[in-house]
């Protein structure tokens, strides 16, 4: 259990930057890695803050170059968790950075299923029902 008195590296402003950048996640969509470049762009402010060393920053950016695809409207949720895990990785010696991508991959599918159902089906269906 961690103490609430621990000094956090990331501020609310840092998280807000990630939130606003997450809206551009689909801007660099490609068929090889889907939204990974958008994820890198969204997370880059916190990665630059957490890893001032160029080698560590390169490793962090490489970590987020892996395949990433989910409903774009739910990306801020995943990026918030990812930011917290990156902060733990930067401050804890015994943290395994492979868990960051494992958690991202574990959240992509379920959130895509929920997000697609809500944003792509339910909302359009209710809009079509209003037309009747």
Task: Please provide the spans of the model-predicted regions.
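Soluble N-terminal domains of membrane-associated systems
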Residues: 1-96
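The first (N-terminal) embedded transmembrane alpha-helix
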Residues: 36-38, 118-123
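Intrinsically disordered, low-complexity regions enriched in small/polar residues
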Residues: 53, 99-102, 125
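Short, surface-exposed, charge-dense and proline/glycine-enriched linear segments
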Residues: 84-93, 104-110, 125
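Alpha-helical membrane-spanning segments of integral membrane proteins, especially the hydrophobic core
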Residues: 101-121
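Single conserved hydrophobic/aromatic residue that forms the stacking wall/gate
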Residues: 124-132
């Amino acid at each position: 259990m961690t103490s609430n008195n621990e000094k956090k590296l990331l501020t609310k402003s840092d998280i807000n930057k990630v939130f606003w950048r997450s809206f551009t996640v689909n801007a660099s969509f490609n068929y090889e890695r889907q939204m990974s470049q958008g994820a890198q762009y969204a997370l880059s402010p916190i990665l630059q803050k957490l890893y001032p060393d160029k080698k560590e920053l390169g490793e962090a950016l490489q970590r987020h170059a892996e395949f990433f695809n989910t409903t774009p409207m739910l990306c801020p949720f995943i990026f918030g968790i990812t930011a917290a895990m990156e902060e733990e990785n930067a401050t804890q010696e015994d943290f395994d950075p492979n868990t960051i991508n494992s958690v991202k991959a574990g959240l992509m599918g379920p959130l895509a299923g929920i997000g697609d159902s809500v944003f792509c089906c339910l909302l359009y269906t209710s809009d079509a029902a209003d037309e009747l």
